[in-house]
Structure formats: C-alpha cells, structure tokens
C-alpha cells in the first residue's frame, strides 16, 4: 500500500502563491535557521505569504519570511523576525534556477515550509506572474467547483 503524504508535517503554506503565479517547476531547499526560529516554527508562528526568493552572489535567500519569536525562547538575544534566511540547494540546481530567473517574467516563490527527516525544508517554485484576467479565471473556476460540490451534496440527501 502506498504511503500517504504526511500533512501534519506541514508548518506553513503560501496560499496566495497559487492565485498570483503559474508554477513551472518546484524545488525543495534546506533553510539556515537559528535555534529560536526552529522553536517558533514548531509552534507554527510563521507567516510565509509575503516571502520571496532572491539570488545574491550565486546563493539563494528568502526575504519576507516572518518568524515570530516565542516569549520564552530567546531571552539572551534580541531576535529579528524579518531576518533574511539562506536557502541550501545543490550548486547545479542553483545554476539552473539562475538561468531561468534571468529570463523575463520568472521569479522564485516560497510555497510551503515542512519537516523532512527532522529538518525544516522550504518548497520553492519557479513561477511566472498571472495577469489580472488569469486571476479572474481562477476565481471563476473555484466558484464553479464550489457550485458543483454544493449541487452534488444536495442530490445525495
């Protein structure tokens, strides 16, 4: 029997990303974190919707990933909740991403944070921004699916 994906290991999802972007490819990257950040992530005190990925000197960094510190976690240091976090990926993957991001219209967006083998990973996507009419189409599709589900639900009663 196939192993089901563990949804409990998800820490945070970027729900706005699917609305604002078309995803070309998805990648998984490790994060360089401090101890207080890991403790806060265990409690789910993170906001990922404003995050984006930049490339500096051949390295990837996540900006705008807001991790709110616990009140008891960091008493001897002053935590910076908007700290820029480095992403860890293989050099070949980074080179491939740099080549694609340099093409017009492509960007890197964090999709979610999750646990994998005791480590916190960030799923990022090579994405292209949606135009306003594409966003409207997404809303129409979502409402259409909702109507169908509602109709099916009333027919089953």
UniProtKB/Swiss-Prot annotation:
The keyword Lipid metabolism does not apply. One of its GO terms (cellular component) is cytosol. Signal peptide: none annotated. It is found in: Cytoplasm. Keywords: Cytoplasm, RNA-binding. It comes from the Bacteria. Residues 135-157 are annotated as: Disordered. GO terms for biological process: trans-translation. One of its GO terms (molecular function) is RNA binding. Required for rescue of stalled ribosomes mediated by trans-translation. Binds to transfer-messenger RNA (tmRNA), required for stable association of tmRNA with ribosomes. tmRNA and SmpB together mimic tRNA shape, replacing the anticodon stem-loop with SmpB. tmRNA is encoded by the ssrA gene; the 2 termini fold to resemble tRNA(Ala) and it encodes a 'tag peptide', a short internal open reading frame. During trans-translation Ala-aminoacylated tmRNA acts like a tRNA, entering the A-site of stalled ribosomes, displacing the stalled mRNA. Belongs to the SmpB family. This is SsrA-binding protein. It comes from Albidiferax ferrireducens (strain ATCC BAA-621 / DSM 15236 / T118). The lineage of its organism: Bacteria, Pseudomonadati, Pseudomonadota, Betaproteobacteria, Burkholderiales.
């Amino acid at each position: 029997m196939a192993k089901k994906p563990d949804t409990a290991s998800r820490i945070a999802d970027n729900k706005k990303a699917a609305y604002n972007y078309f995803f070309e490819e998805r990648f998984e990257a490790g994060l360089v974190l401090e101890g207080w950040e890991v403790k806060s992530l265990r409690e789910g005190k993170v906001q990922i919707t404003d995050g984006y990925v930049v490339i500096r000197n051949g390295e990837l960094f996540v900006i705008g990933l807001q991790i709110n510190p616990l009140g008891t976690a960091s008493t001897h240091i002053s935590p910076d909740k908007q700290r820029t976090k480095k992403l860890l990926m293989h050099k070949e993957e980074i080179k491939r991403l740099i080549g694609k991001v340099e093409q017009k219209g492509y960007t890197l967006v964090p999709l979610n944070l999750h646990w994998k083998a005791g480590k916190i990973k960030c799923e990022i996507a090579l994405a292209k921004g949606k135009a306003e009419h594409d966003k409207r189409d997404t809303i129409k599709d979502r409402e259409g699916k909702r109507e169908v589900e509602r109709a099916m639900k009333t027919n089953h009663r």
